């Protein structure tokens, strides 16, 4: 039995499809119960946000488990299974655990380091627990993931990563525009999520006049209201008017993750005024703005992929492994190793229990046989024999029981011969040679030694 995650996010699927799979609490609970009623699934937890839909289950069969999850998602969303499969990703066993830890830490978010996802994972766990679809494996994974997320946010500065990206985008844009601020400039913001809100805040601080557009106008109005409260002038326009707005703005920033482009080359060709400089900034993955827009005269484009490359190239902390992102990845690795070790030990417990139960049954059988064969033995004598046999069985099994858990905790694999020696602490003459892998020469050392030998032979 292993943990399986089947899901999609802003990185793998268009927003329109994510919206079809989005689940409220009732649908989430019903779907969890439907999942565990499938023959291959025994536990289920669903994380549903505006940028992500992920189903965490425990399965006894990888392929059947994936099929059952996809079938249930198709039933709930009304989207054909074949279409779902083209956007879904699958992680299994330790890879599934690592994925949830990355998600909970904010390392897989559109705005890296955002903390809201911790609460969303906790809520998903609570919903599933209340429905009785959480068992020991998802419980252990959820607790490990939540602990990982807390560590990442308390021990690193990953919280600032998203704002750093937006800040860097503005630095790059201002540098190309030859300006120090945006005073007197009009900035179009497309989107109303975390990244778009950060962009609006930053543009406002630089003195820009904001124009906000979002598919849901109420969300655009909330962003504008926050700007007003900060003393920044902001208008709201209908999302369908975004292309026309290119006539009057100096900068357009898109952070929607929408299906298809929010700004196309045709939009720029039709509405951009040739003698007016236009800076376009794409903060979305997948991309919001068509790369072809940069071919138009007077138009410049910055996108998040180029920003990431430039930011990493300039980040000496990242190169040294001391950046918040690198530190966060190390924490995830530590927690994953701890979780995986605990799970391997937990997996061996049933076998150890079965071994002890078998030994106890053998003791009982031998005591019964002795009692039948020697009726002259009184109750005290039979008690002594029973206790003696139990002590022998306990002592014989103690070392292999302890060593079995130690071997399970170690992720390395061992041969059957080595396993027997390790379990029972056996020292067999001539059975093998103990080798410390750390003492073996690496490929470069072996090649150097071979070259030296050839020189001597020559």
Curated annotation (Swiss-Prot):
**Job of this protein:** Catalyzes the NADPH-dependent reduction of glutamyl-tRNA(Glu) to glutamate 1-semialdehyde (GSA).
Q: Which Gene3D superfamilies match?
A: Glutamyl-tRNA reductase, N-terminal domain (3.30.460.30), NAD(P)-binding Rossmann-like Domain (3.40.50.720)
Q: In which pathway does it act?
A: Porphyrin-containing compound metabolism; protoporphyrin-IX biosynthesis; 5-aminolevulinate from L-glutamyl-tRNA(Glu): step 1/2
Indicate the family of this protein.
Belongs to the glutamyl-tRNA reductase family.
EC number(s) on record? 1.2.1.70
- An example of a Gene Ontology BP annotation on this entry? protoporphyrinogen IX biosynthetic process from glutamate
Query: Coiled-coil annotation: which residues?
Result: none
Assembly state and interactors?
Homodimer.
Fill in the domain comment. Answer: Possesses an unusual extended V-shaped dimeric structure with each monomer consisting of three distinct domains arranged along a curved 'spinal' alpha-helix. The N-terminal catalytic domain specifically recognizes the glutamate moiety of the substrate. The second domain is the NADPH-binding domain, and the third C-terminal domain is responsible for dimerization.
What is the additional note?
A: During catalysis, the active site Cys acts as a nucleophile attacking the alpha-carbonyl group of tRNA-bound glutamate with the formation of a thioester intermediate between enzyme and glutamate, and the concomitant release of tRNA(Glu). The thioester intermediate is finally reduced by direct hydride transfer from NADPH, to form the product GSA.
Q: What is this protein called?
A: Glutamyl-tRNA reductase
**Highest taxon of source:** Bacteria
Q: Which residues form the active site?
A: 50 (nucleophile)
Q: What class of enzyme is it?
A: oxidoreductase
The reaction(s) annotated as catalysed by this protein in its Swiss-Prot or TrEMBL entry are: (S)-4-amino-5-oxopentanoate + tRNA(Glu) + NADP(+) = L-glutamyl-tRNA(Glu) + NADPH + H(+)
Which Pfam families does the record match to this protein? GlutR_dimer, GlutR_N, Shikimate_DH
């Amino acid at each position: 039995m292993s943990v399986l995650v089947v899901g999609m996010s802003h990185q793998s699927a268009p927003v329109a499809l994510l919206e079809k799979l989005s689940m409220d609490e009732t649908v989430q609970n019903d779907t969890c119960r439907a999942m565990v009623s499938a023959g291959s699934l025994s536990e289920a937890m669903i994380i549903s946000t505006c940028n992500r839909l992920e189903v965490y289950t425990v399965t006894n069969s990888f392929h059947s488990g994936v099929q059952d999850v996809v079938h249930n998602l198709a039933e709930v969303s009304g989207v054909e299974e074949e279409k779902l499969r083209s956007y879904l990703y699958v992680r299994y066993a330790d890879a599934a655990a690592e994925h949830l830890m990355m998600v909970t830490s904010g390392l897989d978010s559109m705005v890296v380091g955002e903390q809201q996802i911790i609460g969303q994972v906790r809520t998903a766990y609570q919903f599933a627990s209340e429905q009785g679809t959480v068992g020991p494996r998802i419980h252990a994974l959820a607790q490990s993931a939540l602990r990982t997320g807390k560590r990442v946010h308390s021990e690193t500065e990953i919280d600032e990563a998203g704002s750093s990206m937006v800040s860097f985008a503005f630095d790059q844009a201002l540098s190309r525009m030859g300006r120090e601020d945006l005073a007197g400039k009009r900035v179009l913001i497309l989107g109303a999520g975390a990244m778009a809100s950060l962009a609006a805040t930053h543009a406002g601080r630089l003195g820009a006049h904001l124009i906000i557009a979002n598919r849901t106008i109420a969300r655009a109005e909330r962003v504008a209201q926050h700007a007003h409260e900060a003393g920044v002038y902001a208008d709201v326009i209908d999302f369908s008017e975004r292309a026309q707005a290119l006539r009057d703005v100096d900068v357009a920033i898109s952070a929607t993750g929408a299906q298809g482009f929010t700004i196309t080359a045709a939009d720029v060709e039709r509405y951009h005024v040739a003698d007016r400089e236009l800076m376009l900034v794409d903060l979305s993955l997948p991309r919001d703005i068509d790369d072809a827009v940069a071919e138009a005269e007077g138009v410049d484009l910055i996108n998040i992929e180029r920003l990431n490359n430039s930011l990493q190239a300039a980040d000496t902390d990242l190169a040294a492994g001391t950046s918040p992102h690198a530190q966060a990845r190390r924490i995830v690795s530590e927690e994953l190793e701890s979780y995986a070790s605990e799970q391997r030990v937990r997996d061996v417990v049933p076998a150890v229990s079965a071994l002890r139960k078998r030994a106890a049954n053998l003791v009982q059988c031998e005591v019964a046989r002795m009692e039948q064969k020697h009726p002259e033995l009184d109750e005290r004598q039979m008690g002594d024999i029973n206790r003696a046999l139990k002590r022998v069985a306990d002592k014989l099994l103690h070392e292999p029981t302890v060593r079995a858990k130690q071997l399970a905790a170690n992720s390395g694999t061992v041969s059957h011969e080595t396993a027997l020696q390790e379990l029972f602490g056996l020292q067999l003459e001539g059975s093998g040679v103990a080798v410390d892998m750390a003492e073996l020469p690496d490929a470069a050392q072996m090649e150097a030694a071979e070259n030296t030998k050839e020189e001597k032979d020559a």
